[in-house]
C-alpha cells in the first residue's frame, strides 16, 4: 500500500455583502469571504492538500479563478471533483486534519456540522475529519478580522 501526505493552505478577505461559507456550511456573520467561488477557505485548503498528496498540482490549476463555470460555485462541488480526480490515480482518503484561523465567528459549535457535511461530500466517515479552530490572538490580518485562513493535512493511500 502506498501512503502519501499532503498539505494545503488558503486565505480569503472578509468583506460586507457576501455570505460566509466555511467547512461546507453557511454561517451567520456580518461579513463573508471574497473570492471567485463561494471562497470556503477550509474546503479550498482540503482540496489543495488532496491534490498535493496525489502530485496533481493545486486547486487553481484544476479550477481556475478566471473560468466562468466556477464563478460563485459551491466549493463542495470542487471538493467532490477533487476526490474524483485523486481516485483516477487510485487514491482514497485516509484522514484529514485541519485548522481554521478566525477571530470571529466562534466556530466550536459548528465543527460537528462541518465534519458531517464534508464527510458526506467525500464519502468518508466524519470521524476521519479533524477540524480545529483557533485565533491569532488579535494579531495580523486574521486578528484584525480582515480575513480567515485555513490549513489542512491529509493522508491518502493507493487502493
Curated annotation (Swiss-Prot):
Pfam families: YgbB (PF02542). NCBIfam families: ispF. It is an enzyme of class 4 (lyase). Its EC number is 4.6.1.12. Pathway: Isoprenoid biosynthesis; isopentenyl diphosphate biosynthesis via DXP pathway; isopentenyl diphosphate from 1-deoxy-D-xylulose 5-phosphate: step 4/6. 4-CDP-2-C-methyl-D-erythritol 2-phosphate binds at residues 10-12, 36-37, 58-60, 134-137, 141, 144. Coiled coil: none annotated. SUPFAM superfamilies: IpsF-like. The lineage of its organism: Bacteria, Pseudomonadati, Bacteroidota, Bacteroidia, Bacteroidales. This is 2-C-methyl-D-erythritol 2,4-cyclodiphosphate synthase. InterPro entries: MECDP_synthase, MECDP_synthase_CS, MECDP_synthase_sf. Belongs to the IspF family. The gene is ispF. Its cofactor is a divalent metal cation. Involved in the biosynthesis of isopentenyl diphosphate (IPP) and dimethylallyl diphosphate (DMAPP), two major building blocks of isoprenoid compounds. Catalyzes the conversion of 4-diphosphocytidyl-2-C-methyl-D-erythritol 2-phosphate (CDP-ME2P) to 2-C-methyl-D-erythritol 2,4-cyclodiphosphate (ME-CPP) with a corresponding release of cytidine 5-monophosphate (CMP). It catalyses: 4-CDP-2-C-methyl-D-erythritol 2-phosphate = 2-C-methyl-D-erythritol 2,4-cyclic diphosphate + CMP. The keyword Metal-binding applies. Keywords: Isoprene biosynthesis, Lyase, Metal-binding. CDD domains: MECDP_synthase. One of its GO terms (molecular function) is metal ion binding. A divalent metal cation binds at residues 10, 12, 44. Binds 1 divalent metal cation per subunit. It comes from Bacteroides fragilis (strain ATCC 25285 / DSM 2151 / CCUG 4856 / JCM 11019 / LMG 10263 / NCTC 9343 / Onslow / VPI 2553 / EN-2). HAMAP family: IspF. The record marks 36, 135 as: Transition state stabilizer. One of its GO terms (biological process) is terpenoid biosynthetic process. Homotrimer.
